[in-house]
Amino acid sequence: MVWTWMIALYLFLAGMGAGAFVLSGIAGMAKKPCPKIKMIGFIAGPVCVAVGTLLLVVDAHAGLMNPLRFFYLVSNLGSVMAWGVIILTLFIVVAAIDAIIMVVKKSTPRVLDIIGMVLAVCVAAYTGVLLGDASVAFPLWHPIILPVLFLVSAASTGFALVLVIAHGKAHDEIANIGFTVRSGMVLPVLEALLVIALLGTVAITGGSAAAAAKASVANLLTGGYALAFWVLFIIVGLAFPFVQALHKSMQEKKSLMQQPGLTIAGEVGVLIGGFMLRYLIVMAAIPVALG
């Protein structure tokens, strides 16, 4: 595996697509029907994951570049990559079938929705597991904290993607999924706590990985990636969306309908922060010195 910005983009697209599908699945089960929002996530979800998977295959120097090597990777069930491709493929297939049924019949079997949502959660967690599998070489990629962090971030970015599109295509249904206002306050806090836990845990790493661990944390907090970390991730990606969601929770619904620009800005901030989280985690990681 070659760790580049393309991997960061895959991690972002896969997580966002999975989160979008889950939100739309929940919207489809809401007391008040949200068929437009459900349609948005059921189409955007598998498309994002499919594009991300293509990037993963290409960046792994397989697929179009080396199909035989790719088939070897997939057939090796002892590798994290193989199980990841299986999970990704299953999700894309199930989600695509769900989307087609939704387009044709305007409704979908609840069992199929639930299967798709479970697979979506697995996809979101796998984006962290993929990096965590290399934690021996890259101590920043903690095998336990990172999957949870990416899962929470997937929910944030997936919800944000659906809401941004919904403001143009399903504005009348947004009020029916009011829980997204609460999630807009809770998820950034959870993300921040998990980032603190990740950096704190990595910073106290001992043994031969200690130097690489401390250098990785410093890279983010005070080093070459500090500006992007503090401005684009912390301020734009977490603090601004949290404040915007808090403000939204204190406004009346009528007032909210008149401020779509502020709401959309908050969701775009979430998307920027979601990509920057993955980009920074990938690019700022310092490998353990060999020998």
Question: PLM features: residue spans?
Answer:
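Hydrophobic alpha-helical transmembrane segments
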Residues: Q259-A265
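Short, strongly hydrophobic alpha-helical membrane anchors
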Residues: M1-W5, L290-G291
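Juxtamembrane boundary at the C-terminal end of a transmembrane helix
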Residues: F275-G291
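Long, contiguous internal "core" modules enriched in hydrophobic/ aromatic residues
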Residues: T4-W5, L11-L13, K31-P33, M39, ...
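Selective recognition of specific alpha-helical transmembrane segments in multi-pass small-molecule
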Residues: P46-L54, P188-L198, L277, I281
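Membrane helical hairpin/interfacial module
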Residues: M16-V94
